[in-house]
């Protein structure tokens, strides 16, 4: 079972998702990989996505209104208000202009797009070029995040970027659920008295943050052993891309390309007790 409160059913569902995203019920067009949108229920969250190495990665959590990487902008991702880009390889970021343009055409609110801070200027230039070609606003809010930097998404949700290890600048994201909990010394007081304390400037609650979702994007397994990434392993759901799953490619082959081999995940998990 996965560490951090994840159930055996959740682990089984993860295996199902990994298998499902590599198959399709229909015959693909010549020269294109087979892919269908997959839906699962894990730890109380509905998860939808497409992931084919080198072609497209996009994973959404509809109840949280967020999408990790945008792939080729599959239609199911357009409705999500928050987009988190892990790195700039085309199979992860290629659909970004279309995502923003489609939301604008549908008169949806401008999305908030999070990118590694080192990519922010390049992304701005990308949109400048597309605005010139498309003659449209392509309105969105771009938020550059450094590793370890945090951002409050909503009253109840917060994101933190964490370090990953790919062949280009990259990072993952942890989504935290934020709750206000009444301090023990004020428990049992009448509501009116609590209200008066608030009005007088007294802080009567503590903020509690729980890691709910973590997404790695493309990376080597080193991120699992990074001591700064402890919350990543505590998340209820950790989405990890394992590009190589059999002996047709070695662990060394995977590392050379900045990816994870499934065998390495298993070995690392045994060392860290990520799964037990």
Give the location of each predicted region:
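Active-site neighborhood of divalent metal-dependent phosphoester bond hydrolases
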Residues: 107-111, 119-144
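Active-site-proximal loop/helix segment associated with metal-binding centers of metalloenzymes
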Residues: 52, 152-242, 246-247
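Conserved beta-strand hairpin/beta-sheet module of binuclear metal-dependent hydrolase folds
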Residues: 2-81, 171-175, 181, 205-216
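Divalent metal-dependent hydrolysis catalytic cores, especially in the metallo-beta-lactamase
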Residues: 111-117, 272-276
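Short, well-ordered alpha-helices that flank and scaffold nucleotide-derived cofactor binding pockets
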Residues: 98-101, 125, 267
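Binuclear metal-ion centers of metallo-dependent hydrolases, dominated by the metallo-beta-lactamase
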Residues: 1, 8-14, 135-137, 141-148, ...
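Active-site metal-binding motif and surrounding structural segment of the metallo-beta-lactamase
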Residues: 71-115
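Acidic/glycine-enriched edge-of-secondary-structure segments
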Residues: 52, 57-59, 81-89, 209-215, ...
């Amino acid at each position: 079972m996965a560490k951090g409160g994840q159930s055996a059913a959740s682990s089984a569902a993860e295996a199902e998702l990994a298998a499902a995203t590599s198959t399709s019920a229909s015959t693909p067009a010549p020269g294109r990989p087979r892919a269908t949108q997959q839906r699962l229920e894990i730890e109380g969250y509905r998860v939808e996505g497409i992931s084919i190495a080198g072609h497209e990665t996009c994973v959404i959590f509809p109840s949280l209104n967020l999408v990790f990487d945008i792939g080729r902008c599959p239609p199911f991702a357009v409705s999500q208000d928050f987009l988190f880009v892990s790195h700039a390889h085309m199979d992860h970021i290629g659909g970004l202009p279309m995502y923003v343009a489609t939301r604008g055409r549908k008169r949806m609110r401008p999305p908030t797009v999070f990118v590694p801070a080192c990519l922010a200027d390049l992304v701005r230039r990308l949109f400048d070029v597309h605005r010139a070609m498309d003659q449209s606003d392509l309105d969105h809010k771009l938020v550059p995040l450094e590793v370890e930097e945090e951002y409050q998404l909503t009253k109840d949700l917060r994101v933190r970027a964490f370090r990953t290890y790919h062949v280009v600048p990259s990072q993952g994201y942890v989504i935290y659920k934020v709750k206000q909990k009444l301090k023990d010394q004020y428990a049992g007081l009448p509501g009116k008295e609590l209200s008066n304390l608030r009005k007088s400037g007294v802080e009567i609650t503590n903020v509690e943050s729980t890691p709910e979702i973590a997404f790695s994007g493309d990376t080597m397994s080193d991120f699992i052993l990074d001591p700064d990434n402890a919350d990543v392993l505590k998340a209820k759901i950790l989405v990890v891309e394992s590009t190589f799953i059999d002996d047709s490619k070695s662990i060394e082959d995977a590392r050379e390309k900045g990816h994870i081999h499934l065998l390495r995940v298993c070995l690392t998990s045994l060392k860290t007790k990520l799964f037990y």
